[in-house]
Amino acid sequence: MKVGIIGGGGIVGASAGFALQLGGIVHEIVIVDVNADLADGQALDMMHGAPAIADQVITAGGYEDLADADLICITAGLRRKPDESRLALINRNVVLFKSILESIKTAGHKPDASVLVVSNPVDILTYLAEQELGLPQGRVLGLGTLLDTLRFRSLLALNLKAPATQVSAIILGEHGDSMVPIWSSASIGGLPLEKYPGFTQKLGQDTFTRAKTSGAEMIKKKTGAGFAVGVSIAEVIHAIALDSKRVLPVSTVQRGCYGLRDVALSVPTVVGRSGAEQTLEIELWPKEMQSLKRSGSVLQETLGQVLAAG
C-alpha cells in the first residue's frame, strides 16, 4: 500500500509517518508539506532508520506523487489565533482544506483511493471531503473520536491500575465538546466497568473530563498532540491495508445509523479494504442516545454556518 500524508512535516503528520514506519505494513510513504524542506527532512530522517525496521520506500513529494496513492491522509491545519472565535478558526481551516482538496483533484487520484481526514474540525471537513471528491461511499473517513477513545481507555487504565489493552470503552459523536462517552458497554477484562474494583461515578466522570480536555492539555504542555494521534492514524490505515474489519469510532457521513443522516460524526464502524464498510448500532442507554443525537444536531448547526459562509 502507498500512503501519502499531506501536512507530513508537522508534528501530527510526522508522528503518523513514523507510526506507519514502525508498523512495517505499508510499502510506501510520501510526505507532502507546504514547507518542502521540512517534508524532505522528515522523510530522510525516517528513511535513515529503515534498515532497522522494514523495507519501505519513504520520500518527500508533491500532490502529483499522490496520484497513484492507495490512501491519502490529510493532517494539515491552522492554529487558533489569540482571541479568535471557534467559528472563525473553523472557517479559516475550511478555506485551507478546500484548497487541499482542489490540489488533490487537479493532480488526480485513484478512483478507489481512500482519504483519511485528520485536520480539524474533523467531522465538518470529512463531510466536505466526501462532497468534493466524489469517491465511492465509505472511501472518505475521518479520525473522529478514535483518539478520544484511546485517551479515555488509557486514563481509565491509569486511574484504576488496570492493563490498558484490557480496557474496552468507546466515545462516539463529535470530536469536540459534544462527544459522548458510552458507559453502558464499558468494561475491563470482560468485567463491566461499574463493577471493577475502585471504580466510582466520580472517578469515571473525572476520567472522561480529562480525556475530553486532553487536546488542550497537550497544547499547553507540548504545543500539541503527536505520538498518540500518530498511533490512532496508523490504527485506521493498518485496518484498511490488512482488510482487518476492525470496529473503530471513525467519522463518516451518516445514512441512518441511530437515525442520523447528512452529518459526519463517529459511530462504531467496520474498517477494512474498502474504507468505512459498515456502521454498527451497539445498544445504548436512552441518555446516551439522546446525547448522540444532540451531538449530531450541534454538528449540523456548525455545518450550516460553514456552508452559509461559502
Residues covered by each model-derived region:
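Aromatic pocket-lining residues of Rossmann-like dinucleotide-binding sites
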Residues: 20
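Hydrophobic Val/Ile/Leu positions in short beta-strands of Rossmann-like dinucleotide-binding domains
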Residues: 5-6, 31
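C-terminal substrate-binding/catalytic lobe of Rossmann-fold NAD(P)-dependent dehydrogenases
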Residues: 133-139, 148-310
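N-terminal Rossmann-fold NAD(P) dinucleotide-binding loop
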Residues: 13-14
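Conserved N-terminal Rossmann-fold NAD(P) cofactor-binding segment
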Residues: 32-69, 84, 301-307
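Conserved glycine-rich cofactor-binding loop
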Residues: 9
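Rossmann-like NAD(P)(H) cofactor-binding subdomain of soluble oxidoreductases
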Residues: 86-154
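Rossmann-like NAD(P)-binding element
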Residues: 51-114
